[in-house]
Amino acid sequence: MKKLPAIITLIILLVAAVSCNDEESTWEKYKDWRHTNNDFFTQKDNSVNANGEREYMRVSPVWDAGSYILMKKYKSGNGTKYPLFTSTVDVTYKGYLCNGTVFDSTYTYTDSIVTFKCSSTVTGFAIALTNMVVGDSCEIIIPSYLGYGEQELSAINPYSTLIFGLKLRGIPGYEIQVKP
């Protein structure tokens, strides 16, 4: 009976060691992919057009001025309201990785417009939406830490920079939070 606490302690230490090894192996397993994505984001962040102007503007959320996504507007809309984080929006989009692999697209659906709350998306996507008006069409580039981070999804590796062609079609649920 005196050996039971020692055995339990040993099991806990082994589980902790295996968990740490798994995290390290994921970090190491995707080392090249992580560097490729970071380099891609940096290259796009530093890219300029023929006039020497930035191709992408940095868009930061009000809650974290040190974080940002990149946005290049193709078409400016005629809307006057910006969606809030709690708003419901209608959008069309195509998402792909820095190697050109498409991981999602609304254009594969019968009705290409999808409706969801800004708050139900990855942080970078919500940042973009809350800085658009109806009719805006743009390309956004989201660094991995504002996307899925180290999460592994079926079509998206950990540490992936996400690129979207995005159009805000409507704001069917513009919600203003009421202060108590």
Range-by-range predicted roles:
Residues 15-19:
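C-terminal motif of bacterial Sec signal peptides marking the signal peptidase cleavage site
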Residues 4-5, 20-180:
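Cross-family detector of peptidyl-prolyl cis-trans isomerase
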